[in-house]
């Protein structure tokens, strides 16, 4: 288990938020269509082999990954989320790891790295470092698949539309700050291309998008 990065108060508060929201996580689902499109995209992608799931949360997508994967390593910083994921999945092909993703080093490489509702929570100044980390997690010819959204409500924008810092509340009104970068698919494709990735990002008919691809032969410059 890695220790959270306490040097960044915003990221520490983001972890605290996801620990606190775990019991009511499903109450805060983003409204709108598109879930069927995401499921169809994952089924077409076929995440086979050994899969690393980053920020697994309550295990919603872990179940789906097991339709194809030989094994899944599911990582999350919030023990409360991992407890819910373990109760949901109950599968001996899954290894659960509690770790801060900004401080964790994997002990092996994987055929696929998957993450949902995570890239938007990575600060812009850590974007390039995060994707270097993803590359280090993959075996040669390894693939990546991710799901996210750009959904932010006006009352969350405590520092204005241009800031990636937001405020979210629990059902009892308790407020926490978190990171939420409202990427658009074309923007993500461009940023990743400059880092040497070959990724296609696709919008659904709802608020979400998905991306899939792999690292190119050489990494470019830019990002973040």
Task: Kindly label every feature range from the protein language model.
Residues 57-103:
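Class I SAM-dependent methyltransferase SAM/SAH-binding core
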Residues 128-140:
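A short glycine-rich, Lys/Arg-flanked "PGG" loop and its adjoining helix->strand segment in the class I
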Residues 182-215:
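Conserved Class I S-adenosyl-L-methionine
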């Amino acid at each position: 288990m890695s220790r959270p990065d306490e040097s960044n108060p915003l990221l520490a508060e983001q972890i605290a938020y996801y620990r606190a929201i775990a019991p009511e996580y499903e109450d805060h689902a983003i409204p709108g269509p598109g879930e069927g499109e995401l499921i169809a995209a994952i089924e077409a992608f076929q995440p086979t082999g050994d899969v690393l799931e980053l920020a697994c949360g309550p295990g919603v997508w872990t179940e789906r990954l097991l339709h194809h994967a030989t094994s899944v390593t599911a990582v999350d910083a919030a023990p409360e989320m991992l407890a819910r994921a373990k109760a949901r999945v109950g599968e001996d092909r899954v290894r659960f790891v509690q770790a801060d993703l900004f401080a964790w080093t994997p002990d092996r490489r994987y055929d696929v790295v998957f993450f949902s509702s995570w890239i938007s929570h990575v600060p812009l100044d850590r974007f390039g470092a995060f994707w270097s980390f993803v590359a280090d997690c993959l075996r040669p010819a390894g693939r990546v698949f991710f799901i996210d959204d750009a959904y932010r409500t006006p009352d969350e924008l405590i520092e204005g539309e241009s800031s990636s810092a937001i405020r979210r509340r629990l059902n009892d009104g308790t407020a926490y700050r978190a990171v939420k970068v409202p990427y658009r698919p074309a923007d993500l494709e461009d940023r990743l291309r400059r880092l040497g990735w070959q990724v296609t990002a696709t919008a659904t008919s709802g608020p979400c998008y998905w991306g899939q691809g792999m690292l190119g032969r050489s990494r470019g410059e830019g990002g973040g």
